[in-house]
Amino acid sequence: KIVNLAPNYSDVTKFADLWVPVRPGTDAAFLLSCIHVILQEFHVNRRSTYFYDYVKQFTNLPFVVQLDEQDDGSYLSGRFMRATDFSQYAEEENADWKLIQLEQGTDKVRLPIGTLGFRWEEEKTGRWNLEGKDTQGEEFDPMLSCMGDDGEFEEVQVNFADFTDTFDTKLGQTEGKGNRAKKVLRGVPVKRVTNADGKEVLVTTAFDVLLAQLGVNRGLSGAYPTDYDDASQPYTPAWQEQETGVDRELVTRVAREWADNAEKTEGKSIF
């Protein structure tokens, strides 16, 4: 099936199964809404085994992100935590380029092979691939979310920048001067780890940051959208409708069909 995402009816559209006539310059809003739907329905409401296993092994989503506390008690998403941040891994070769994961079920800090630092080791060990193993060759299950399956977790408020209203998308009315990004406070599940300096640090995973940034509702506190029809928060189908002119039901349909095909064919959906 071919879906043509374009403002104008063209020769490509004639041969497509579906035409999505977005306003010029708003395709990002449409696609971000698709991602919102896919995360909500294939990762949260129902955990797709194929997607779950794939993102844990082949993406940066299970890697640990440090949260930086602000003066008002809220937090900002910081950098990825590295081997240099932990005493047990600080002497690793290229330690600044080796990233950290947490082990599911134990919360233990683990150093997986396969990140950039392993590619450039002096001794060519061939440990270049993410295989779910640590530096000792032991297999472990990386934690994808700090929320956990048992429903027990700690939550803090994290500041996210909403850039969706920095420019007006109405044609011919943008003056070239952007608005300031809005500050959005959202709850994020966290874990506590002790770094090489003996300091306790709040961390989360890139997956948890992504879900919060895109407003995927998991029952956490803060400015999350209530449902797909909530146009007050960015990335929902209703929000993209007012930006792109595409009906909210259509964006939901496209997202579901794209992800459903990817799940059933193990990755044979392409944009």
Q: What feature does the model see in each segment?
A:
Residues K1, E263-F271:
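Short, intrinsically disordered, charge-balanced linker/junction segments flanking boundaries
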Residues S10-K14, L18-K264:
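Long, well-ordered, tryptophan-enriched scaffold segments
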Residues K1-N8:
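Short, acidic/small-residue loops that bind anionic groups at enzyme active sites
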